[in-house]
């Protein structure tokens, strides 16, 4: 009926262009144009997103066509949101608009730069494994830069960390020395699973490796002999596990296993040998010093003997001169007569 009236108005306008249209006909014409415009817009969006909407409708994913239109203007990928909602709905999770994984919450996480599909996969895996994981918690972990799906998988299937890790430190064994001075080279494997509650702000694998290595070295160092460690390696692991090394970390230590123990050098014997060699060198140095002092004293005595000999030679050289002077002075004859007189008396 409206189309007939519109056609009639156009005919009147054509017959009487100067008279124009009345106000009611003009409003009707504008209304028809607006209706056609909105119908064209809706048709455009329906042709573009109708398949996604039908997929969501058939999957009971609670995604409306208006939501898809809003995503078009907010630069949100509707394929990702619809696929995520379908997966959540098929997994039997709560998709309620109030407290469930709603379309609005998925859009907000997408606009924040998060990985929506990774979060949904993690939540579904946690739900299957009966691990408590809410959407807000998973989204926060994802936005913090952690791989939430890998964290859930590690919680379900614990992974093994080598201590030390050759990829990080370049070393294959830990070196520790018992009290008797024998070096032990140990290779350890630490089984851990993710502690989702501590995943944000918790220490990483490097901290766990460092703590375990420090505890193992300390435990071996407190052993009296290396034989006790070789006989009972479990003694070390029990001590290490009792220290609570996984505190404030993103992991929970399941077990610590000694994979290999090798006996290295006898550090104590080597140190004793080095000390003995040092003492020998000191004794040799002292003996050499005493020998040098003795040689110096001998040379000094020889110098004194030579000096005394020279004095003796000088004294012997003065004897003939003294005798000659005595003959000249007649002291030798007087001395002889006096001696003869004393003899006769």
Swiss-Prot record:
Superkingdom as given in the UniProt entry: Bacteria
Membrane topology category: Single-pass membrane protein
Cell compartments where the protein resides: Cell membrane; Membrane raft
Regions that span the bilayer: 26-46
GO annotations of cellular component type: membrane raft; plasma membrane
Pfam families linked to this entry: FloA (PF12127)
Alphabetically ordered keywords of this record: Cell membrane, Membrane, Transmembrane, Transmembrane helix
InterPro entries (alphabetical): FloA
Function as written in the Swiss-Prot or TrEMBL entry: Found in functional membrane microdomains (FMM) that may be equivalent to eukaryotic membrane rafts. FMMs are highly dynamic and increase in number as cells age. Flotillins are thought to be important factors in membrane fluidity.
Complex formation: Homooligomerizes.
Family (UniProt): Belongs to the flotillin-like FloA family.
NCBIfam families assigned to the protein according to its UniProt record, in alphabetical order: PRK13665.1 (NF010186)
The protein, known as: Flotillin-like protein FloA 1
Source organism: Rhodopirellula baltica (strain DSM 10527 / NCIMB 13988 / SH1)
């Amino acid at each position: 009926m409206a189309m007939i009236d519109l056609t009639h108005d156009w005919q009147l306008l054509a017959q009487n262009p100067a008279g124009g249209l009345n106000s009611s006909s003009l409003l009707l014409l504008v209304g028809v144009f607006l209706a056609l415009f909105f119908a064209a817009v809706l048709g455009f969006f329906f042709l573009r997103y109708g398949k996604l909407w039908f997929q969501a409708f058939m999957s009971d994913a609670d995604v409306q066509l208006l939501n898809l239109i809003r995503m078009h203007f907010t630069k949100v990928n509707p394929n990702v949101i619809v696929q995520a909602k379908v997966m959540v709905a098929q997994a039997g999770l709560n998709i309620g608009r109030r407290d469930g994984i709603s379309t609005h919450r998925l859009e907000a996480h997408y606009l924040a730069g998060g990985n929506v599909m990774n979060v949904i996969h993690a939540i579904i895996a946690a739900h299957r494994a009966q691990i408590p994981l809410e959407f807000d918690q998973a989204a926060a972990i994802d936005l913090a830069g952690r791989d939430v799906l890998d964290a859930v998988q590690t919680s379900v299937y614990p992974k093994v960390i080598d201590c030390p890790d050759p990829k990080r430190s370049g070393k294959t064994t830990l070196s520790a020395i018992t009290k008797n001075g024998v070096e032990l080279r140990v290779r350890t494997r630490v089984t851990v699973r993710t502690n989702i509650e501590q995943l944000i702000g918790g220490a990483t694998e490097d901290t766990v490796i460092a703590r375990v290595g420090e505890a193992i070295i300390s435990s071996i160092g407190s052993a009296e002999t290396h034989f006790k460690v070789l006989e009972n390696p479990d003694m070390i692991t029990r001590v290490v596990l009792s220290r609570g090394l996984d505190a404030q970390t993103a992991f929970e230590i399941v077990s610590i296993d000694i994979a290999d123990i090798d006996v290295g050098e006898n550090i104590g014997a080597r140190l004793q040998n080095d000390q003995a060699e040092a003492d020998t060198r000191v004794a040799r140095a002292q003996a050499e010093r005493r020998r040098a002092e003795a040689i110096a004293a001998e040379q000094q005595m020889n110098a004194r003997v030579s000096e005394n000999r020279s004095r003796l030679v000088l004294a012997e050289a003065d004897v003939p001169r003294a005798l000659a002077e005595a003959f000249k002075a007649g002291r030798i004859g007087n001395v002889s007569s006096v001696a003869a007189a004393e003899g006769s008396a």
